[in-house]
Amino acid sequence: MDGNPFEETMTLRSDVGALLAEMPIFSGLDATLLREIASAVEWLSLPGGAKLFSAGDPSDALYMVLSGCLGAFSDDPTRRRFLARIAAGDMVGEMGLISGRPRSADVVALRDTELARISAKAFNEVLRGQPEAMLRIARLTVDRLAQSQSPAAAARSRGACTFTVLPQSVEVDFGGFASRLVKALSELGRAELVWSVRAKTHTSQWFNRIESSNDYVVYVADPTPDRWTKLCVRQADALLLLARAESPAGNWAALRWPHDHSMAPQRSELVLLHDSTLETGAAARWLADLPELPHHHVQSPGDYSRLARVLTGRGVGLVLSGGGARGFAHIGVVKALREAGVPVDLVGGTSMGAILGAGVALRWSTDELQERIRRAFVDSRPLRDYTLPFVSLVSGRKVSTSLYEAFGDLAIEDLPIDFFCVSSNLTTGQSMVHRRGTLWRWLRSSVSVPGVLPPVLHNGEVLVDGAAMNNLPVDVMRELGRGPVIGCDVGGADRAFTARTDEIDVPLPWQLLRWMKARRQRPSIFQILWRAGMVNSNASTIAHRAQSDLILQPPLAEVDMLNWDAFDRAIQAGYEYAIRKLEELPADSPILRSAVADA
């Protein structure tokens, strides 16, 4: 055994004064006051899976994590969400203690955890008569709260630091995968790989030392449910369920083995290893019994770097808005990001932004993206298959054909880069996010401008253009908690949408010819329907811009949303604008910190 666990625990406890001095809210207090606070400390050992407190409980104490790890979870019984990781050296509960408000989240031990507890009564008694110290603590707490609420900080707090690779069978190359993942994590910080042969004889304090001396630790579990596997599960912030994509879908024996790490399933993620080519249909097969599980495709060396960023809350998400022909500017933005070495680890979009985002998720080169989109929307003129306007002005067949020719029978879950698109459900009155299913079909729903294209009818519900309710779905990307988010909004003010005459009614039949000759004085029915389908989401778009770590709004006000011939001009405008904005970013921007040389 590596040391005496009782002695090591006592060493941690004897250093509580030094630990207090390192805590931001106590730093700067004089030594006498720190000793008084230290004397009021109580000790608490919490086994993995045990709850420290629940949302709504009275805020009767603050806690310092000496070893182990806690997780904060939302208290929504219908949709439990992981909010933050509280690691050794962190503090929890001080906000409620100072504000007097009840606990705002459930806090659970993600593994065996040692805590130092200071009751509200002891805290107040020590600081009574110390107004300057109390004011300092209050100010630091407010500052800490403000910092923690920044989008980038929130994503990092939800990112994992310790991972357990759980192979589905002995046929999986779990050793090679773990080694390559550690190499990728080493690009982000100090990382270490822990095998059973190295760690089986060590105490929990040995594991704590390994984790405290590294930014990231990867444990390699056995495919069988043995003691080592149980220990790995208890140590993990995230379980990586590893499988060969081409293998028949199966279960993980270790997950059927009873253990007391009740929160583990909240942090499980499926990783599918591919050979030389991506196995289409594999994700749906594996996700049939795990429909809500996040999943990742790993094939090339770059996929390990992407996986490392996404797992640790450093993945870059790109969100592309709708905007008709203005959406071509997204191609220029993608080109600029690639030239700057900024990776796109996740992508989502609405309407035209969804189509371009799907191309990015397929890892099309910039030239291929440009050529395919030109062929689909400029050369083929898909909005010229007019029909009797019972449901829409256009039949939609040419749009459907163009989308099918571009994407075939691909499913969203098979895309190498995580992708989603958004449509508007007129039946429920809510925005719909599509993460699974046939790609071209959901893209077709996302671009179905009401009145211009027929809606997509699905399970008795009517789906139309996502821009009607959420034209810039940064909120959807932010909810994933994977890292910084870049939003590109091309659906803003439209100077081309103007009228140069004053009138109320359409002219009488014998005046129509002269009226049509002057059509440039008034918007067309296409323009009216297109614009009307977007303005409803203006308020949400403004809010979602603010949620972006970087918001890009290329100058496209002079580009008509239906001017497909503005293809090259829009691309160039997006490219030049994005280059300027990226050059203006501060060196410590979370987006630039994620930049890679081989993006």
Stretch-by-stretch model annotation:
Residues 1-167, 173-175:
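Cytosolic regulatory regions built on CNB/CRP/Popeye-like sensor folds
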Residues 153-188, 192-197, 315-322:
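Walker A (P-loop) phosphate-binding motif
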Residues 211-227, 464-467:
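Switch II (G3) loop of P-loop NTPases
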Residues 219-299:
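Conserved catalytic-core segment of NTP-binding enzymes
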Residues 265-268, 273-292, 302-303, 316, ...:
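Non-catalytic peripheral regions of patatin-like phospholipases
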Residues 302-347:
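Helix-rich "cap/lid" substructures immediately adjacent to catalytic or cofactor-binding pockets
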